Amino acid sequence: MLCQFLMKKTILVSSCLLGCKVRYDKTSKPLPKEQLIALEEKFNLVGVCPEVLGGLPCPRQPAEISRDREVLTQSGQVLSTFFLKGAHKALNICKNYGIQLAVLKSKSPSCGFGKIYDGTFSGCLINGNGITSDLLLKNGVKVINESELDAWLKTVKE
């Protein structure tokens, strides 16, 4: 078993995609079973929720990133410190495990990659990345979201 673990690369995965109820509304958004099995066959998975790592509870108020990159709740509470703390903890996990790829939850103010909510709580999406995705990318960790997973898995060598 240890030998098998050592032979596989390790990747970071948003905990909510693994079925953990860590989202702001205390739900999960699990990957389809087939995708999860394919990931587990090829990789060691390390689940993280940067928001929880940063000290936020479940449930919590939804948050979005404002134009000036502050993370705010709809009531105006500033959560940037929690998000940054969680992002740095996720980066440290990547460094400690030699992780070079993260599969993160789309649209999230922490994990979103490519598209995030615009900060107005209107449901509108804009181009951009979440706090954790940005930090990982700046430190050489490749980031994809769950909608890109099938295409990416096809490129992975056995």
Identify what each model region corresponds to.
Residues 16, 105-108, 148:
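Short, well-ordered beta-to-alpha junction loops that form the rim of enzyme active sites
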Residues 26-29, 117-123:
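Short glycine-enriched, charge-decorated loop/helix-capping segments at active-site entrances
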Residues 105-120:
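Internal, conserved structured core segments that host functional sites
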Residues 2-6, 31-45, 86-101:
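Short amphipathic alpha-helices and their capping/turn segments at secondary-structure boundaries
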Residues 19-25:
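Short N-terminal binding/cap micro-motifs at the start of the first secondary-structure element
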Residues 4-6, 53, 61-89, 93, ...:
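Divalent-metal-activated hydrolytic enzyme cores
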Residues 29-73:
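Short, surface-exposed acidic-centric catalytic microdomains
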